[in-house]
Structure formats: structure tokens, C-alpha cells
């Protein structure tokens, strides 16, 4: 995640370490924080691998810029949908502000993948709710109060994913319009039907 964010920020302008920390912590906060011990070794690694380069140095403060090799690496990271699947919801929304670097079809690819990702969670949670209904009828393994508390937690998660799904549908509609107006070509396919929220 931090490699993605560092390269993403450098696609906009050169930055120094202190500014990296401030901006990244604003993006991932309020409780998650990137430390100096995590950031500076990563900067060293990226520079050694040719992804970034020092363009200014004042005392102990160095300003970095992204290289062409770094831009290619960033592009691959943006389109990666298989790494860290359990944390992909967070990664997706961190990518959205940097969609400007992608072609229209690539943006829609990420959006459609995330729609399917949300759908998979909704289908899974629907199955969990059905299972809880079976437990309630059979009164096995769990007490009624335990079942009720579990159902409440599942419904909460379901509502969150349903909201995310609808937000991404709106994002997709905006992207299709943007592609039609700005890129001059329509790449949008029919958006999937939203999964209805479980009652």
C-alpha cells in the first residue's frame, strides 16, 4: 500500500520525506500512521531500484521525483486486483483519487472489478443470514440471544457493502460519461444490477 501511495503522490509533483508522511497519514488516518522507520527504508529501496530519484537535497532533507520506470511500476500497481484481497476495499478507494493516470477502459476495469468484489461480499453475507435463520429454527449451536447479536452484526456489514456498491455504481456512471465526453469513445458496458439489501 505504501509503495502505491508514494509513487502515486510523486506522479503529481516531487516531494520530500516529511511531506510524504503528512499527506499519507492524512489519507490513511486517523489511527493508522506511517512511521519514519517504515517510510525511509521504502524510499531508499525505491531509489535503489530506479523507481524514484533524488532531485534536490538540503541538509538531511531530500526531495524525490518519480522516474519513467517508477511510472510503469505505479501503473502496474494501480491495475493490480489480486494482491491483498482481504484489504482491497481500502486499496480501491485509495486508488480512486489517482484514476487520472489511467485510460478510460482501465478505470472501468477497476470499477467493474470492485463492483464484483462488493457483490461477492453481499452474496456471502446473504448466505450467512440464511444460515442464522436455520440456526434460529433448529436452536442448535447458539442461543437465541447469540443468534440475534450475530444477525445484527451481519446486517451491519451487509448495509456497509450495499452502500459501497451503490457508491461505485455512481462512480461508474460518472466514468462512462467522462469517457464519452473527454475521450470521445464509449467503453461502458451495462452496469450490473445492484444487489438488494437484506431486510
Placement of each model-derived feature along the sequence:
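Basic helix-turn-helix/winged-helix DNA-binding cores
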Residues: 1-91
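Mid-protein regulatory/catalytic core that forms ligand/cofactor-binding pockets
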Residues: 108-190
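Positions in alpha-helical segments
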Residues: 4-8, 94, 109, 152
Amino acid at each position: 500500500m505504501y509503495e502505491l501511495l508514494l509513487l502515486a503522490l510523486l506522479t503529481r509533483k516531487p516531494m520530500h520525506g516529511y511531506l510524504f508522511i503528512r499527506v499519507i497519514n492524512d489519507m490513511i488516518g486517523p489511527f493508522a500512521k506511517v512511521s519514519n522507520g517504515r517510510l525511509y527504508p521504502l524510499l531508499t529501496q525505491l531509489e535503489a531500484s530506479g523507481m524514484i530519484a533524488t532531485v534536490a537535497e538540503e541538509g538531511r532533507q531530500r526531495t524525490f521525483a518519480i522516474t519513467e520506470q517508477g511510472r510503469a511500476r505505479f501503473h502496474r500497481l494501480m491495475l493490480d486486483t489480486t494482491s491483498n484481497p482481504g484489504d482491497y476495499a481500502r486499496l480501491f478507494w485509495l486508488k480512486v483519487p489517482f484514476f487520472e493516470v489511467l485510460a478510460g477502459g482501465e478505470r472501468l476495469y477497476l470499477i467493474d472489478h470492485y463492483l464484483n468484489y462488493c457483490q461477492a461480499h453481499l452474496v456471502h453475507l446473504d448466505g450467512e443470514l440464511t444460515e442464522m435463520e436455520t440456526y434460529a429454527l433448529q436452536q442448535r449451536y447458539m442461543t437465541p440471544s447469540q443468534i440475534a447479536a450475530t444477525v445484527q452484526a451481519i446486517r451491519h456489514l451487509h448495509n456497509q457493502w450495499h452502500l459501497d456498491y451503490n457508491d461505485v455504481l455512481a462512480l461508474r456512471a460518472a466514468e462512462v460519461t467522462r469517457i464519452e465526453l473527454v475521450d470521445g469513445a464509449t467503453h461502458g458496458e451495462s452496469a450490473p444490477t445492484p444487489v438488494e439489501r437484506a431486510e
